[in-house]
A protein has these predicted regions:
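Accessory cap/linker subdomain of secreted extracellular hydrolases
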Residues: 30-66, 206-375
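Short beta-strand/loop motif that positions the catalytic acidic residue
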Residues: 386-388
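Histidine-bearing beta->alpha loop at or near hydrolase active sites
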Residues: 415-430, 441
């Protein structure tokens, strides 16, 4: 457990002098732990200075904040610092973005100011929660989109160097956090570089790793073919990716079929999520598709099943070319000998299902690539907190179960704490993020393991 805190500095760190200072002439190479990127210290930084209303978070009605937008390598980054900086730095790693989206830029209209309009942007909401509590906050847009785990780990880790330049001082403590794919990035950095971080926070993170993420969407693709044959022209395990317009048409047809006759989709939902019974502490497993327990009627219930299907299918159908390119032209998925089972299915029904699911062979080079980018070990030296929704259709419970088992196997359970929230969806609210962050900070500073609030 990292307890390298010292008393907080009493004076706020002033960065105004840095805004007019060139650190060197020409391009620099920023390097940290083998990661590197070019940096122009004389670039035209966009500097925002303003007041943030922190009264909703128990702070002052007008907190002075300085924000800086810069570029490192091929990616934009943001650093925010409150005038009453407490000395700690929080890094944020964003989640997956479809490969047809532009890389290297944030997905909102810059500048991200300090008025009410910032609440319309997820990053603005998180920034407000963090900065209003005295922390500095930094985030990278990543050089690339798609399954950019490698780029995300590099660009987020290098924020350690860049943020220090803008803050004007070495942070007392540094916390790395992220959502979904970004949660995997945050935990991966915590595993590999515990000397750089004091704690890590993952929300809905892919903590089972990228091989498990591929298994999810690739199993879903094969099972979709068994229940809805012929709707997709390309064969499982091959491209091309669909255009956004083509996927929208596909999604509309799936939704219409499901509402007209939900029996097929309900039957598909009763398939046991592949391999989940081996990870479930109770040995039961989870359904392939979740329904929203809070759905008010049958139409909404079927709609939640449709969303549970289309989420993973969008990851596959819109990004299959990106996955193939990163995996040296191959897939890391193999179901040639996998036996699909169902809840309350007869042996004959399961045999019929297995006969209808297309079979795919894994490419060893693709397996190797995704093992390195990234397969978490669960071996921890610093506190790690994870927020997970029990009915997450994008990052199912198997990821949490897998990571908890890895932490136990490596003797790291004392460094890992999961906050399980009973709900449907792939999100944590900004308030939940802040609650978990403050609990993580207390854990690091005092050694007190978090006790999570009971959710309705």
């Amino acid at each position: 457990m990292s307890l390298r805190h010292c008393p907080r500095p009493l004076a706020a760190i002033l960065i105004a002098t840095l805004l007019t200072t060139a650190w060197s002439s020409g391009l620099e190479t920023i390097e940290l732990d083998g990661y590197r990127a070019t940096f122009d210290p004389n670039q035209d930084f966009l500097v925002l200075e303003g007041e943030l209303d922190c009264s909703p978070f128990g702070g002052a009605a007008a907190v002075q904040v300085t924000g800086t937008l810069g570029r490192l390598g091929e990616s934009d980054y943001l650093v925010y610092q409150p005038a009453d900086w407490n000395g700690d730095l929080v890094l944020w790693a964003h989640g997956f973005r479809h490969s047809f989206m532009p890389g290297g830029t944030f997905l909102f209209a810059l500048p991200l100011g300090f008025g009410p309009e910032a609440d319309e942007v997820e990053l603005g909401q998180l920034r407000n929660q963090v900065v209003c509590r005295g922390f500095a906050f930094a985030a990278s847009a990543y050089e690339d989109t798609g399954l950019a785990v490698a780029e995300g780990m590099r660009d987020t880790h290098l924020l350690n160097v860049i943020a220090r330049r803008h803050l004007g001082a070495e942070p007392v403590a540094t916390y790395v956090s992220g959502h979904s794919m970004g949660g995997l990035i945050a935990v991966g950095l915590a595993e590999q570089y515990p000397h750089r971080y004091d704690g890590a926070l993952s929300t809905c993170g892919l903590l089972g790793g990228m091989l498990a993420a591929h298994d999810h969407v690739d199993h879903m693709r094969g099972l979709f073919e068994a229940f809805f044959p012929g709707m997709i022209e390309s064969a499982p395990g091959s491209g091309p990716s669909l255009t956004p317009e083509a996927f929208d048409a596909f999604a509309s047809e799936v939704g219409a079929r499901a509402q007209e006759d939900p029996a097929v989709l309900r039957r598909m939902a009763s398939v046991r999520f592949p391999g989940s019974e081996r990870l479930d502490p109770e040995g039961v497993g989870i359904p392939l598709l979740w329904t929203d327990p809070a759905a008010p009627d049958a139409t909404a219930e079927v709609g939640s099943l449709v969303n549970s299907l289309l989420g993973p299918m969008s990851l596959y159908l819109l990004n299959v070319d990106d996955g193939l390119a990163r995996g040296a032209g191959g897939f890391p998925f193999d179901n040639r000998h996998f036996a699909y089972t169902g809840f309350d299915w007869t042996a004959e029904e399961e045999a019929d299902l297995n006969a209808r699911v297309p079979r795919v062979e894994a490419d060893p080079w693709a397996v190797r690539y995704w093992t390195f980018h990234y397969e978490p070990s669960g071996d921890l030296e610093i506190p790690v907190v994870s927020i997970m929704a029990t009915h997450d259709p994008i990052v199912p419970l198997v990821h949490e179960w897998s990571y908890a088992q890895n932490a136990a196997r490596t003797g790291s359970s004392e460094h890992y704490s999961a906050w399980m929230i009973p709900r449907y969806g792939h999100f944590a609210t900004p308030q939940e993020y802040a609650t978990a962050l403050l609990a993580l900070v207390e854990w690091v500073e005092t050694g007190t393991r978090p006790t999570w609030p009971t959710m309705p």
